């Protein structure tokens, strides 16, 4: 198509060019319609990258050195520069290196991680896990955890194993990698390139036989433990008059952090896990944090500088909190699987290695002594060691003498039975007396040895064996959990409610406020929360909402007396409490039915409130 036909074609004039930057330093150039939705663009990017699970990723644009994530329901041109929306005929011709020059300069968009998870097994798609790994790689390069310097060397070893495979002497020598691509700049400056190139090959060699997928999992698990890697940072102002932001808001996987900006460093002021955040309120540019358990006078008030930034932070905080709460049962299950696998590996290596060591030592001692008693003792020890070897493996000597088809259950039960061993501790502890002066010991020494041989010791706790036999849990590197869109935007999942949008009318004025509330935990976690809270207190105003629940009957009585006043009360349920006086399940189910979609919120007011209280508890507002 020539330029004249291109400018006369209205359809082509509505086309624009976008450049998508990927976490692995690659880019995609796409021609799209100027009125496309952000969700449609994200789908196109995932199709080009062959991503099946993209719920942890998002599209962002950089505004004032901050990544602003797009609302998928909005149109793309709301986030683009003004020049990008102009007609193609009015835009100067751009360089061909950016794509088709007729569509003008491309809009720069970043495809990056929006929601962090602490375990790579939560990412079902390997391609998504690959880009998640690369995103953390870039974050690690900017990390400043000076007290965790050893972690960067371990991360570099995992990354080299994932990128280059097993260490090979004839291939991986000298400067076979760039230290700047695997270490933060301050580590390279402190240690020097020669130091890194000298010691990292040995650590790379220790990761032998790890596949790329396993190395990605280990890298993700270790990288998120650094305090400043899996974090989103946003500027905050102490008051409206500030020109330069003096505070920084850090959104982590587990909560919110507030930092004081000091020259080139950040000093941590507050660290609020999600369980300690009572409510977040955005009123225009004002941002309020109400910590759980503190009186209302102790709330923290900051400013975002723009109502749009307030809305963006509210959505990001609410979705991150919802995902964190919904993933807790899954994470507990994964930790249990991994712990059982580690115990099993440790148990097998412990039995096998110690018995092999005992056999080698006793064999040398028996040869050195040359006595008949020593040889007799060696035969007896070899019999015990053989029995113990059959216990440490599922297919022991008895399995060889009686060949038959065994399933996984049979092999597991047989290994559990063979774990009942006769101990060899007495013989190893008295090994010197057996090899040097056994004949002079007489009958007393032989009787003691016979008594020691009759002692039986259980290598494993029977309760552990019963529990493992019932669960029979196995972990594989390819095991993964699917994160669905329901975990971010669902109405109810795993007992955790979504956003509740209500219109609350004030008794003193005719105006209404849009209150967005998020319920944090299900009834399953309620007893754990109550165990952490004191049941008695001398000052009721200093109690959290969980403590106020203990005085619900008093509040119901107060509400009846003060119903005609200007104060407003909102209670979690109006039914009577159960025998324990803790919760009303029928009211929770009724409220979960009335849950609305998370966003967009009606723009009838500039007041947004995010309530992160853990339970359906009465709210006492004075």
Curated annotation (Swiss-Prot):
Residues 384-395, 425-438 have a biased composition (Low complexity). SMART domains: B41, FERM_C. InterPro entries: Band_41_domain, FERM/acyl-CoA-bd_prot_sf, FERM_2, FERM_central, FERM_domain, FERM_N, FERM_PH-like_C, FRMD6-FERM_C. SUPFAM superfamilies: PH domain-like, Second domain of FERM, Ubiquitin-like. GO terms for cellular component: apical junction complex; cytoplasm; cytoplasmic side of apical plasma membrane; cytoskeleton; plasma membrane. The modification Phosphoserine is found at residues 522, 525, 542, 544. GO terms for biological process: apical constriction; positive regulation of hippo signaling; protein localization; regulation of actin filament-based process. This is FERM domain-containing protein 6.
């Amino acid at each position: 198509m020539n330029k004249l036909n291109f400018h006369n074609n209205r359809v082509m004039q509505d086309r624009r060019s976008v450049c998508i930057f990927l976490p692995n330093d690659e880019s995609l150039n796409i021609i799209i319609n100027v009125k496309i939705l952000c969700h449609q663009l994200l789908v196109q990017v995932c199709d080009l990258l062959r991503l099946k699970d993209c719920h942890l990723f998002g599209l962002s644009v950089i505004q004032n050195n901050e990544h602003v994530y797009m609302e998928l329901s909005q149109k793309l041109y709301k986030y683009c520069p003004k020049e990008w929306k102009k007609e193609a005929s009015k835009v100067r011709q751009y360089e061909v290196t950016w794509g088709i020059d007729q569509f003008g300069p491309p809009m720069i968009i970043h495809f990056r991680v929006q929601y962090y998870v602490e375990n790579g097994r939560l990412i079902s798609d390997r391609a998504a896990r690959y880009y998640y790994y690369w995103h953390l790689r870039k974050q690690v390069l900017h990390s400043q955890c000076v007290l965790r310097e050893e972690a960067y060397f371990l991360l570099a070893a995992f990354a080299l194993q994932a990128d280059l495979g097993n260490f090979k002497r004839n291939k991986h020598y000298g400067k076979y990698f760039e230290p700047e691509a695997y270490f933060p700049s301050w580590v390279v400056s402190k240690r020097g390139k020669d130091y890194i190139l000298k010691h990292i090959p040995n650590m790379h060699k220790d990761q032998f036989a790890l596949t790329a997928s396993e190395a990605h999992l280990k890298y993700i698990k270790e990288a998120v433990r650094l305090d400043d890697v899996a974090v989103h940072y946003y500027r905050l102002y102490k008051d409206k008059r500030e020109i330069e932001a003096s505070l920084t808001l850090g959104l982590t996987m587990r909560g919110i952090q507030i930092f004081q900006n000091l020259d080139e460093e950040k000093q941590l002021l507050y660290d609020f896990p999600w369980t300690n955040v009572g409510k977040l309120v955005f009123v225009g540019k004002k941002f309020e944090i109400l910590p759980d358990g503190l009186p209302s006078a102790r709330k923290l008030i900051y400013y975002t500088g723009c109502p749009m930034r307030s809305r963006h932070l509210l959505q990001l905080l609410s979705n991150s909190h919802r995902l964190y709460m919904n993933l807790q049962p899954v994470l507990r299950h994964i930790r249990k699987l991994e712990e059982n696998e580690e115990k099993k590996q440790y148990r097998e290596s412990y039995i096998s290695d110690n018995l092999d060591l005992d056999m080698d030592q006793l064999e040398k001692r028996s040869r050195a002594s040359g006595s008949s008693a020593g040889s007799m003792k060696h035969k007896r020890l070899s019999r015990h060691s053989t029995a113990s070897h059959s216990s440490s493996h599922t297919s022991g000597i008895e399995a060889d003498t009686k060949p038959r088809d065994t399933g996984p259950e049979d092999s597991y039960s047989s290994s559990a039975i063979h774990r009942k061993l006769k101990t060899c501790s007495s013989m190893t502890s008295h090994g010197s007396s057996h090899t040097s002066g056994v004949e002079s010991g007489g009958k007393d020494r032989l009787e003691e040895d016979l008594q020691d041989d009759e002692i039986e010791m259980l290598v494993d706790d029977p309760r552990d064996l019963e529990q493992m036999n019932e669960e029979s849990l196995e972990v594989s590197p390819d095991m993964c959990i699917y994160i669905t869109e329901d975990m971010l935007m669902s109405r109810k999942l795993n007992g955790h409610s979504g956003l509740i949008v209500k219109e609350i009318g004030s008794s003193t004025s005719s105006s209404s406020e849009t209150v967005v509330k998020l319920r944090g935990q299900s009834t399953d976690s309620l007893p754990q929360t109550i165990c952490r809270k004191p049941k008695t207190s001398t000052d009721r105003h200093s109690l959290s909402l969980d403590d106020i629940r203990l005085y619900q009957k008093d509040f119901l009585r107060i509400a009846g007396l003060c119903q005609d006043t200007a104060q407003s009360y909102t209670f979690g349920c109006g039914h009577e409490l159960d025998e324990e006086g803790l919760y009303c399940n029928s009211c929770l189910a009724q409220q979960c039915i009335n849950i609305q979609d998370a966003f967009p919120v009606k723009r009838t007011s500039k007041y947004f409130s995010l309530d992160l209280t853990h339970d359906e508890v009465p709210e006492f507002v004075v």
